[in-house]
Amino acid sequence: MRLFLSLPVLVVVLSMVLEGPAPAQGAPDVSSALDKLKEFGNTLEDKAREVINRIKQSELSAKTR
């Protein structure tokens, strides 16, 4: 029964893979990807700094020292 159900699924998946990318998914713009990566890095850095400062200023860290 499993084989009977898995064969049509396999055929559909193979047809989707062999079809190729859609026209809208053509070549991605490298500069926009780099800009998004840079923006992600900046926001991650800001959030990490906020967390570190919050930990430094918290009473719990002062009590454990």
From Swiss-Prot:
Its main location: secreted. One of its GO terms (molecular function) is fatty acid binding. It is found in: Secreted. InterPro entries: ApoC-1_sf (IPR043081), ApoC-I (IPR006781). Keywords: Lipid transport, Secreted, Signal, Transport. Gene3D superfamilies: Apolipoprotein C-I. Residues 1-26 form the signal peptide. Pfam families: ApoC-I. It comes from the Eukaryota. PANTHER family: APOLIPOPROTEIN C-I. This is Apolipoprotein C-I, basic form. The gene is APOC1B.
